[in-house]
């Protein structure tokens, strides 16, 4: 039975996780994400799950990794400073192909920054925060409903591609309250277990899609798990250049080859747009209003909302660049995804940035003024 609720975005993330089958949460309180931990502490025991408050964010993500290898779905939630502490384990999860979800409710930064104010300043950290070559998936909600929906999708993507998936929220979306619809059931992608008996199983031998089968500890399969370069059996193989190349290339290709399948964008009024406004997360709310105001003023403006910043939706952004003469990137930082748009649109469209820091969202009038300026 479908039900409606009037709740915060953070609460919606927690409820989305439960609906998606999450049965383990480890975390450490940090503003503005703490409500997720509080809600998980309330909901998980009712579902037979486990909530653990760890000593810090390093331990939190380590605990999630361990729980996932025991066979459950796991998640943590944090904000900028805690996200920084998690980066070593992000790389470990990528190397060991551990499917998990991290919710980052972004706040003003760097360092301690603005704990109670909003930002989108962790977007590049989500992609490049840990050392080495690897790929992750990130989603960026702009509403409370999307906090629920994107968290559900994050778990399914994590299981499908055996990769850390990040839900990159912000203080505005995390703390706003809106009416949302929660279905009685959601589509859950089951983890792909072994298709051969234990004596024939190679834990990191990948089929054509590049994603290995994954048993749980205790299922009777031998599963060496190491952050070292490893062979298909999971055993350290760090001195083998060809083996390292083969492994890391597969870790990247299993995401990049499916980029168009993973990518999710929303477009409005872009068919005839001379100026396309590109945004993600909370600023998209102001962008939609500003574009409508621009149309009322006779300006052919449209907008492209990026729901999956990573892997970057190159196909959709390139199409927007070819279609429009000018692109305007709106984000709550001094320019992060702006550089990705510039890279993809090079030689096809003029790209401008409307940044915003200080903890506040763009007002529609600010965006409209920039659109009008670009239309001259």
Curated annotation (Swiss-Prot):
Give the E.C. number(s): 1.2.7.3
Q: What class of enzyme is it?
A: oxidoreductase
Q: Name one GO biological process term.
A: sulfur compound biosynthetic process
Query: What cystine pairs are annotated?
Result: none
Q: What is this protein called?
A: 2-oxoglutarate synthase subunit KorA
Q: Which GO terms describe its molecular function?
A: 2-oxoglutarate synthase activity
| Quaternary organization | Heterotetramer of the KorA, KorB, KorC and KorD subunits.
Swiss-Prot/TrEMBL catalytic activity: 2 oxidized [2Fe-2S]-[ferredoxin] + 2-oxoglutarate + CoA = succinyl-CoA + 2 reduced [2Fe-2S]-[ferredoxin] + CO2 + H(+)
Pfam families, alphabetized: PFOR_II (PF17147), POR_N (PF01855)
Key words, A-Z: Oxidoreductase
PANTHER family (alphabetical): SUBUNIT OF PYRUVATE:FLAVODOXIN OXIDOREDUCTASE, SUBUNIT OF PYRUVATE:FLAVODOXIN OXIDOREDUCTASE-RELATED
